[in-house]
Amino acid sequence: MERYVFDYRKLNGRIGEVFGSQKEYAKALGVSDSTVSKKLSNKAYFSQKEIEKTVDILGINPGSITAYFFTM
């Protein structure tokens, strides 16, 4: 089975703008820094719940979800 590789640069930039660090974003998301690191490096996928919470805490327009999470 082929594994999809997503480009999270836009998401990473927004995390930096809002939280200043991946560690602070991880706290707000309710997961460990290492979990976020795995997700942003395509070693693990974001769950639907994590995407929904991220959209909320980062103030992402729901119409822009694809640009942040599903760009390949």
Task: Annotate each language-model stretch with its function.
Residues 21, 47-50:
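Residues that mark the N-terminal boundary/hinge immediately upstream of a DNA-recognition element
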Residues 65-72:
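Short amphipathic recognition helices of helix-turn-helix/homeodomain-type DNA-binding modules
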